[in-house]
Curated annotation (Swiss-Prot):
Keywords on record: ATP-binding, Cytoplasm, Cytoskeleton, Hydrolase, Nucleotide-binding
Enzyme class at the top of the EC tree: hydrolase
InterPro entries cross-referenced by the UniProt entry: Actin (IPR004000), Actin/actin-like_CS (IPR020902), Actin_CS (IPR004001), ATPase_NBD (IPR043129)
Gene Ontology CC annotation, any one: cytoskeleton
Gene3D superfamilies per record: 3.30.420.40, Actin, Chain A, domain 4
SUPFAM superfamilies on file: Actin-like ATPase domain
E.C. no: 3.6.4.-
Reaction catalysis annotation: ATP + H2O = ADP + phosphate + H(+)
Protein name (database record): Actin
Organism: Cryptosporidium parvum
Biological function: Actins are highly conserved proteins that are involved in various types of cell motility and are ubiquitously expressed in all eukaryotic cells.
Location within or outside the cell: Cytoplasm, Cytoskeleton
């Protein structure tokens, strides 16, 4: 087989977006929402060639007549039937490849239940007949993408955030911390505080508008109290946003109050500590000897780490928590929105990785549990 034919496919399944493409590329070829929509009233649209299910952007655009479901909640697959639909859509409609001709690298959330890894493996080999596959933890791939093998990754996406300490390429399981606070919660919170200002956003369509406002206008304050004072005394922090219908709204302190919830989950009524302190706790659960290496390699990853100001604020928070002599370095790679996918693309193109794949033969011999022996 020629090089082109045996290229691996890399699929990063997030709670909010699926990122998929071909190993060796520097960015995913397709990025679409992890949504499956089914008609609310099947068979009402007579004469329309109505499908029984829609995936991704098409589901998003027809959301008026559909019931939308997210098969991945908080990073973990909860609905396998819909997940299969998403993978089918990824291979056949988005990438337009035959999965039976390519090895497939999938990503998983840290602390993914064992049965889930087995189920992923089973579906790949039995439903899609892939020749080989591998499952890797998302945060580990992000670290590879930054050119490191040791460090701590703060991975925050749409459904969940994790801090994952990694030493010499292996995640340290007992020190992984999970925070059920991510992009979707921040969008909801922004909807709420904009509502307090008199702008009402309620429908799923309007929610998408709020997500866009969040992505375009929000930032993280270095000092929240100072920023609040500044926003009350002058209007220099105010920005305008034009809604699809032409109305213009003004957004002020909401710009930094929304993502501040990452550092103060109390804003959302959550008991948890913020991402700065969670990172600190995660490091403290690791062996004394490697903490220095972790403090000097704090890598941000995922769409919810895209706020301007997040690197400086993380540095400030950790400096106040860590021993005073400790060198702290927070790395915020510009491509961090896709760094999980990029890490997968790098890893699956390495010649040394080729012996790591779980092959069809191995699967037929051992069954789904092979995944625990080969992917750790």
């Amino acid at each position: 087989m020629s090089e082109e034919e045996t290229q691996a496919l890399v699929v990063d399944n997030g709670s909010g977006m699926v990122k998929a493409g071909v190993a060796g590329d520097d960015a995913p070829r397709c990025v679409f929402p992890s949504i499956v929509g089914r008609p609310k009233m099947p068979g009402v649209m007579v004469g329309m060639d109505q499908k029984d299910c829609y995936v991704g952007d098409e589901a998003q655009s027809k959301r008026g007549i559909l019931t939308l479901k997210y098969p991945i909640e908080h990073g973990i697959v909860t609905n396998w039937e819909d997940m299969e639909k998403i993978w089918h859509h990824t291979f056949y409609n988005e990438l337009r490849v035959a999965p039976e001709e390519h090895p497939v690298l999938l990503t998983e959330a840290p602390m993914n239940p064992k049965v889930n890894r087995e189920r992923m493996t089973q579906i790949m080999f039995e439903t899609f007949n892939v020749p080989a596959m591998y499952v890797n933890i998302q945060a580990v791939l992000s670290l590879y993408a930054s050119g490191r093998t040791t460090g701590i990754v703060l991975d925050s996406g749409d459904g969940v955030s994790h801090t994952v300490p990694i030493y010499e390429g292996y995640a340290i399981p007992h020190a992984i911390m999970r925070l059920d606070l991510a992009g979707r919660d921040l969008t909801d919170f922004l909807m709420k505080i904009l509502h307090d200002r008199g702008y009402s956003f309620t429908t799923t369509a309007e929610r998408e508008i709020v997500r866009d406002i969040k992505e375009k206008l929000c930032y993280i304050a270095l000092d929240y109290e100072e920023e609040m004072k500044k926003s009350q005394e002058s209007s220099e922090l105010e920005k305008t946003y034009e809604l699809p219908d032409g109305h213009v709204i003004t957004v002020g302190s909401e710009r930094f109050r929304c993502p501040e919830a990452l550092f103060q989950p109390g804003f959302l009524g959550k008991e948890a500590v913020g991402i700065g302190e969670t990172t600190f706790q995660s490091i403290m659960k690791c062996d004394l000897d490697i903490r220095k290496d972790l403090y000097a390699n704090i890598v941000l990853s995922g769409g919810t780490t895209m706020y301007p100001g997040i690197g400086e604020r993380m540095t400030k928070e950790l400096t106040s928590l860590a021993p005073s002599t400790m060198k702290i370095k927070v790395v915020a790679p510009p491509e961090r929105k896709y760094s999980v996918w990029i890490g997968g693309s790098i890893l699956s193109s390495l010649s040394t990785f080729q012996q790591m794949w779980i092959t069809k033969e191995e699967y037929d011999e051992s069954g789904p549990s092979i995944v625990h022996r080969k992917c750790f």
